[in-house]
Each structure stands twice: as structure tokens, then as C-alpha cells.
């Protein structure tokens, strides 16, 4: 990263299935002058404890973040869903390096974005939530975490459905 000196760094999880143009998320990050932007989506409250769950204010700024909480906070006005992290992050490069260096020195840290870094920076940094939506409809886009054998199996069955929710072909 240092060799190329980018202004921003995009971090992705490797155990998810989705199709996303990252350009609008990066543009949102720049437009809001964020130090960090977290891709997010609504998940049913009963499944939210498997994810990082956040609360944002009316401007889209993340004000609370809990990694895999036992009692996830619901989205205000919608008791059936929580706002979950997709594990997709955009950082200002220097800010990212500063946080990684600081976290590396923390004896009791697991060195995990969701458990350690994000909750630690919320008060001092500008962390924004970016809701993942279909560009054409504005509806929540298809996204599946396939980090377990069961979730991987279910996602595969969805993708071979007669009319799958996600078109994996570019046509």
C-alpha cells in the first residue's frame, strides 16, 4: 500500500456473495469526508447476533457498533431488523495505518475491526454507514455471508433457483 500511496483503501471480506460497484461507496466516503465508511444492510433481528451491528444517526454517522451482540439494537422504528456490517470498509489510508499501528500495541486486542478498531474510534473519528442498495431500484441488494457450511449451502441453492435473486452473469 505504501508503495502506491493511495488516498483511500478498500477492505473486503472473502466469505460473502454479492455483486457491488464500489465506486458509489467510495464517492459517498469522499463526499462525507469520512475517516472510515462501513458497508451495511438490514438483517432480521433474530439473525443479527451473527454480525457486527451498528446504530447510525440521521446524518448516517455510526454512533454505536457491537460485534456479534447477544441483544442487537434494532433500527429505530423497525423492531424486526438491525443494521449489520457487511465487512466492507473504506478508509483514508493514513487514518487506517494510524489505527492499525495503535491497535497493534494494544495487549488485550484481538486485532479485529469489528471487536476492537471500530468501537474504539467512534467518538474521535468520522465513521459513516453506507447502506448497500440496488442502483436501479434503491432496494436492498443481494448479499449473503457464507462463512459456515450451512450458509454456503443455502446460498448455493438460492443461486441455482429458477429465478435467482442474484444474477451472477453480466448479461
Give the positions of each predicted feature:
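Long, charged amphipathic helices and adjacent flexible linkers at domain junctions
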Residues: 162-171
Amino acid at each position: 500500500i505504501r508503495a502506491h500511496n493511495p488516498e483511500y483503501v478498500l477492505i473486503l471480506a472473502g466469505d460473502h456473495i454479492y455483486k457491488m460497484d464500489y465506486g458509489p461507496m467510495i464517492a459517498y466516503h469522499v463526499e462525507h469526508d469520512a475517516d472510515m465508511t462501513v458497508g451495511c444492510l438490514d438483517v432480521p433481528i433474530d439473525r443479527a447476533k451473527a454480525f457486527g451491528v451498528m446504530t447510525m444517526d440521521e446524518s448516517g454517522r455510526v454512533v454505536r457498533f457491537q460485534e456479534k451482540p447477544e441483544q442487537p439494537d434494532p433500527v429505530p422504528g423497525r423492531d424486526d431488523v438491525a443494521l449489520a456490517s457487511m465487512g466492507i470498509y473504506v478508509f483514508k489510508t493514513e487514518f487506517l495505518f494510524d489505527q492499525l499501528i495503535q491497535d497493534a500495541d494494544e495487549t488485550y486486542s484481538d486485532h479485529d475491526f469489528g471487536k476492537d478498531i471500530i468501537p474504539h474510534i467512534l467518538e474521535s473519528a468520522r465513521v459513516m454507514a453506507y447502506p448497500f442498495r440496488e442502483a436501479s431500484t434503491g432496494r436492498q441488494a443481494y448479499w449473503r455471508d457464507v462463512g459456515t457450511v450451512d450458509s454456503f449451502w443455502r446460498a448455493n441453492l438460492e443461486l441455482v433457483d429458477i429465478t435467482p435473486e442474484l444474477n451472477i452473469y453480466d448479461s
